[in-house]
């Protein structure tokens, strides 16, 4: 035993010697540091920023730029102006006008490390914790006011199956005591609630509250001062998992301070009612106190003379009679008011019935007018008045954004940052994010408006163009029929007058028919039903006076370009092609371009693939080549002239055949354009 004790003593002595050596070493190191600081103290006092000639080992330089000089960890942020530290580590600078946030968490019992300026009032909190405290205050006060105004809407009673034998609860009024933990202030008006435990199997409810609201002290929109004392509870508050999604969203927005709270409007509406109730209660209390004081005085005083007693009794009787008469008058007034209200309701019902009948009549008239005006031209719908007023109201409504636009309009971004003296990078990014979200919503609305406007204008153009074309076609058919009838009548008259000269008359009739056909073609070209090029009998393209094969003759067109395939030294294909086409070749010459390997080999792979894809697409989409119309017409005309000189008897049959051939050619050309 003695040996063991000696060994322990020796070990303790060795440990003490080691600790003393470490202490001496640390003190020597500390002395060296203090000397270095004293030597360089002049540079620190003159300016907060360290000069480049300082002897302190500062590792805050990187690529010729100064960074934060924090000793706790390597910080890559730049320091503030006239200081050596960034915003997060500015508290390491003793001369900086900042102090630490006074917020202490209830769970970890640690203090917040964010800096706060000295100019702010006590208690000093950073922006985030200040907002948390304000939002919690609002929520607690709203819940208290709601429980006062509507006790049925308070937290529901628990079921017996969900409550255990031992259960504790905190009322919604206890949340006011938790605010003192945030702010550090203790109000004398508030009293902590006590919780009790019960061992009974069945739950028992003991709910006694004494609430004294000083509403007369409210100035403007200030919050009411509450003095609360709640007795014990023995049941748990059960969270409602079956809440509506809107309520859940509003709770989340309350935490972030975006909305004004669930009971904010109810609080405003019920302020007047609460004031009136409070005044009535005070009046009743004063009356009771006055009556009690009178009773006490009567008991204390000696018995007066019978005359005085009779006088008092008479006065009391008179007062009672007056009260009875006043009550009767009040009842009569109430009855009269009820009768008046009933009469007003009956009148309103009659007026509503009359209005409904008038509306029905107006609707019937509108339906009849709409039926009459269905065939009217739609050009009036695009006047200046319609575009300025009705389109903006009805047609150019923005798409549904899930109520994001309302949130952005109601949301005040300066609410967070108005009272803050310094902003971190995260807060600055948050502010910019809000502004960008507003811009995105504006651009979406504008895009939808332009899109709907283009749709309406396109429909209007199509409807007007179709109606005009139908009218023109009907008018032209009538004119052509009249001309044909006149020509036939003239020919019959000539035949009857000149029976002797059959040969000459037949020749004249043939010439007249040819001239009439040419006149018809010229008229149709002038009216815009045929292409303006010579000897072309094809319908023109939309918004132009030329067909597809002769579209290059139109000087105003800007979509088409000629094919660049060289047929000979000085000639090109010249067939119209879209300018977007790559390569600039028509459908027939694309195959030749594919087979010409010498040109394609010199190109890179990606360009080859792109050209092949374009060629395949254009083969499917390119319009088919048009049938030349001029050659067969000229040939038929020559045959007609030769046959007329040889055989006069067979001229009528040949002319009919030639006319039928010309009509078939026109139909073929029209079908090719339509395809």
From Swiss-Prot:
Instruction: Name the source's superkingdom.
Output: Eukaryota
Question: Which compartments is it annotated to reside in?
Answer: Nucleus
* Annotated keywords: DNA damage, DNA recombination, DNA repair, Nucleus, Transcription, Transcription regulation
- One GO CC annotation: nucleus
Q: Which residues form the signal peptide?
A: none
Q: Where is the composition biased (Basic and acidic residues)?
A: 664-675
Q: Where is this region: Disordered?
A: 1-39, 183-203, 274-324, 473-523, 627-675
A GO biological-process term: DNA repair
Keyword 4Fe-4S carried by entry = no
- Renumbered to this chain, the Low complexity biased-composition regions fall at 282-318, 482-519, 634-648
Outline the subunit composition: Component of the chromatin-remodeling INO80 complex.
Q: Which family does it belong to?
A: Belongs to the INO80D family.
Q: What does this protein do?
A: Putative regulatory component of the chromatin remodeling INO80 complex which is involved in transcriptional regulation, DNA replication and probably DNA repair.
- What name does this protein carry? INO80 complex subunit D
Q: What species is this protein from? A: Dictyostelium discoideum
């Amino acid at each position: 035993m003695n040996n063991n004790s000696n060994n322990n003593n020796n070990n303790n002595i060795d440990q003490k010697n080691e600790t003393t050596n470490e202490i001496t070493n640390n003190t020597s190191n500390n002395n060296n540091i203090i000397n270095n600081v004293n030597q360089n103290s002049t540079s620190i006092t003159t300016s907060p920023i360290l000069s480049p000639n300082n002897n302190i080992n500062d590792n805050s330089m990187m690529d010729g730029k100064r960074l934060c000089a924090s000793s706790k960890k390597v910080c890559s942020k730049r320091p503030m102006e006239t200081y050596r530290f960034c915003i997060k580590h500015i508290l390491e600078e003793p001369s900086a006008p900042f102090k630490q946030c006074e917020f202490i968490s209830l769970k970890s019992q640690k203090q917040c490390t964010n800096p706060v300026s000295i100019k702010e009032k006590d208690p000093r909190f950073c922006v985030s914790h200040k907002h948390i405290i304000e939002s919690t205050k609002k929520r607690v006060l709203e819940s208290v006011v709601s429980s006062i105004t509507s006790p049925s809407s308070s937290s529901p009673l628990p079921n017996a199956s969900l409550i255990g034998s031992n259960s504790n609860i905190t009322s919604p009024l206890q949340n006011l005591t938790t605010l003192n933990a945030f702010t550090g202030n203790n109000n004398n008006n508030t009293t902590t609630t006590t919780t009790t435990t019960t061992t009974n199997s069945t739950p028992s409810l003991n709910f006694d509250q004494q609430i004294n609201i000083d509403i007369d002290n409210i100035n403007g929109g200030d919050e009411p001062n509450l003095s609360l004392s709640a007795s014990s509870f023995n049941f748990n508050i059960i969270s409602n998992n079956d809440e509506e999604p809107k309520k859940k969203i509003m709770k989340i927005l309350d935490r972030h301070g975006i909305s004004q709270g669930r009971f904010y409007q109810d609080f405003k509406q019920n302020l007047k009612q609460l004031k009136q109730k409070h005044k009535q209660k005070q009046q009743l209390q004063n009356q009771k106190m006055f009556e009690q004081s009178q009773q006490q005085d009567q008991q204390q005083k000696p018995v007066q003379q019978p005359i005085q007693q009779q006088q008092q009794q008479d006065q009391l009787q008179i007062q009672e009679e007056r009260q009875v008469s006043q009550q009767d008058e009040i009842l009569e007034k109430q009855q009269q008011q009820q009768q008046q209200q009933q009469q007003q309701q009956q009148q309103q019902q009659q007026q509503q019935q009359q209005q409904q009948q008038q509306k029905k009549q107006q609707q019937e008239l509108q339906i009849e007018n709409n039926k009459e005006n269905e065939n009217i031209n739609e050009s009036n719908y695009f006047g200046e008045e319609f575009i300025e007023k009705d389109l903006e109201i009805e047609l150019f409504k923005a798409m549904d954004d899930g109520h994001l636009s309302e949130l952005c309009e109601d949301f005040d971004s300066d609410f967070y940052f108005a009272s803050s003296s310094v902003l971190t990078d995260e807060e600055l990014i948050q502010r910019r994010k809000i502004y960008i979200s507003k811009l995105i919503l504006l651009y979406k609305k504008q895009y939808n408006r332009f899109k709907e406007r283009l749709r309406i204008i396109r429909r209007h153009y199509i409807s007007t163009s179709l109606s005009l074309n139908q009218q023109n076609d009907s008018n032209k058919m009538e004119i052509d029929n009249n001309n044909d009838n006149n020509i036939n009548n003239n020919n019959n008259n000539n035949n009857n007058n000149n029976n002797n000269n059959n040969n000459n008359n037949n020749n004249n009739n043939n010439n007249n028919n040819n001239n009439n056909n040419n006149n018809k073609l010229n008229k149709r070209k002038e009216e815009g039903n045929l292409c303006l090029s010579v000897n072309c009998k094809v319908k023109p393209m939309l918004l132009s006076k030329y067909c597809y094969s002769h579209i290059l003759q139109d000087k105003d067109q800007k979509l088409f370009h000629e094919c660049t395939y060289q047929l000979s030294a000085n000639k090109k294909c010249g067939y119209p092609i879209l300018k977007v086409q790559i390569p600039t070749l028509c459908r027939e010459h694309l195959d030749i371009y594919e087979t010409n390997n010498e040109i394609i080999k010199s190109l890179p792979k990606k360009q080859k693939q792109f050209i092949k894809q374009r060629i395949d697409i254009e083969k499917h989409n390119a319009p088919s080549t048009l049938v030349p119309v001029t050659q067969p017409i000229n040939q038929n005309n020559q045959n007609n002239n030769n046959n007329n000189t040889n055989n006069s008897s067979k001229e009528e049959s040949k002319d009919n055949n030639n006319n039928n051939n010309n009509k078939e050619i026109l139909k073929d050309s029209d079908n090719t354009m339509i395809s």
